[in-house]
């Protein structure tokens, strides 16, 4: 999942998300990176308000393009951060040099899953094809003069749950806060401003976050199975409870099959109980974070039927543990590929996507997230 860089002052950065009261998640920035500053009524975005999209990664307006892409990076590789790409075989390469990356903190070991946020230093990033990145780099070179000029005019913008770079925006509908696409089509009404957080944000000042307009949180509990919980999960949960901030949970999957997802589900239940989180404590769902993961010696599934079994096994483990408020989280291209299954679509309640409008339209309920 996708969390932000740590810009620490009073609190640290967090991804801005908006949710409907019926529990839909709508990132105002498709995971907007922000810093919660001293002024409790504002969010200070860490992006340039005049950032030229020609210098940004495709589908990731806040991620900078590399200056070049190595000839060793194949077109069918997947770019997973500003400087890393993954081959179809699962090898991780440096985008600019083409060298294979073996750092266990980034790729894990045969028996140990890495922290998925380590590849991006905790920042938001939606995986994109290397072919698209190469095309974007070529275009960027042609516009390098204009881009350089644009960067000189950069400023920090203050906004309270801004819209995204493509025209999707906040507004009102039936006298409640709502989120719209660039054509003013309603995506979610009764929306709430929510942040997605993990240990990468350090010790968040939750009182200031609440005073600054944060209306809820999705807290990372952990990833894979057999790993420690997120180092700040207990603190974040306790603070949200103390201050009356509604919260949900997310868990990043490394499952290759239903056996792995069942272990992940059992791990989620165990840690929820360990941290004193009952089903009634969760105002937002427990999200199963399904992405194209990277783990040495292992490769993620590509068959939707396999993923369907993975999702059903995870759901079964959570439901057996008494947790019924569940949802799938992913991004558009993955949902249109390995997750292209009617049952998974029916369970999908949060989709990360940059752009002027939501391309995924198969939400099973009205509670949904962008």
Ranges and model annotations:
Residues 21-38, 44:
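Sec-dependent signal peptide cleavage junction
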Residues 1-14, 29:
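Bacterial Sec-dependent N-terminal signal peptides
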Residues 19, 27-30, 137, 241, ...:
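Generic low-polarity alpha-helical segments
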Residues 65, 73-76, 80, 87-88, ...:
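Surface-exposed substrate-engagement region within the catalytic domains
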Residues 14-22:
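Bacterial N-terminal signal peptides
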Residues 179-313, 320-321:
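Substrate-binding cleft of extracellular glycoside hydrolase catalytic domains
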Residues 37-189:
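Non-catalytic propeptide/linker segments at domain boundaries
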């Amino acid at each position: 999942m996708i969390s932000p860089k740590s810009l620490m002052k009073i609190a640290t950065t967090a991804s801005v998300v908006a949710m409907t009261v019926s529990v839909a998640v709508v990132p105002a920035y498709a995971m907007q990176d922000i810093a919660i500053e001293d002024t409790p009524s504002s969010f200070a975005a860490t992006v340039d308000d005049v950032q030229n999209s020609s210098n940004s990664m495709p589908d990731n307006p806040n991620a900078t393009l590399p200056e070049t892409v190595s000839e060793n990076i194949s077109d069918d590789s997947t770019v997973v951060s500003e400087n890393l790409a993954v081959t179809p075989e699962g090898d991780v390469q440096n985008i600019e040099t083409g060298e294979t990356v073996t750092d266990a903190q980034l790729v894990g070991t045969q028996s140990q899953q890495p922290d998925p946020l380590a590849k991006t230093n905790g920042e938001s990033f939606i995986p994109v094809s290397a072919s698209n990145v190469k095309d974007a780099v070529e275009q960027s070179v042609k516009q390098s003069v204009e881009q350089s000029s644009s960067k000189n005019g950069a400023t920090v913008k203050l906004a309270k749950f801004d819209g995204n770079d493509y025209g999707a925006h906040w507004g009102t509908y039936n006298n409640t806060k709502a989120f719209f696409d660039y054509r003013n089509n309603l995506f979610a009404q009764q929306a709430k401003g929510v942040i997605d957080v993990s240990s990468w944000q350090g010790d968040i000042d939750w009182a200031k976050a609440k005073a600054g307009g944060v209306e809820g949180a999705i807290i990372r509990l952990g990833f894979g199975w057999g790993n420690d919980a997120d180092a700040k999960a207990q603190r974040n949960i306790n603070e949200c409870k103390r201050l009356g901030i509604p919260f949900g949970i997310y868990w990043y999957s490394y499952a290759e099959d239903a056996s792995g997802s069942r272990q992940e589900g059992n791990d989620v239940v165990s840690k929820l109980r360990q941290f004193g989180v009952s089903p009634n404590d969760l105002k937002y769902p427990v999200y199963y974070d399904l992405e194209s993961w990277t783990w040495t010696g292992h490769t993620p599934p590509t068959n939707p039927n396999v993923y369907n079994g993975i999702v059903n096994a995870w759901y079964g483990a959570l439901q057996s543990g008494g947790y019924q408020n569940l949802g799938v989280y992913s991004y558009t291209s993955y949902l249109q590929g390995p997750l292209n299954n009617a049952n998974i679509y029916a369970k999908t309640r949060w989709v990360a996507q940059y752009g002027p409008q939501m391309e995924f339209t198969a939400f099973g309920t009205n509670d949904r997230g962008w």
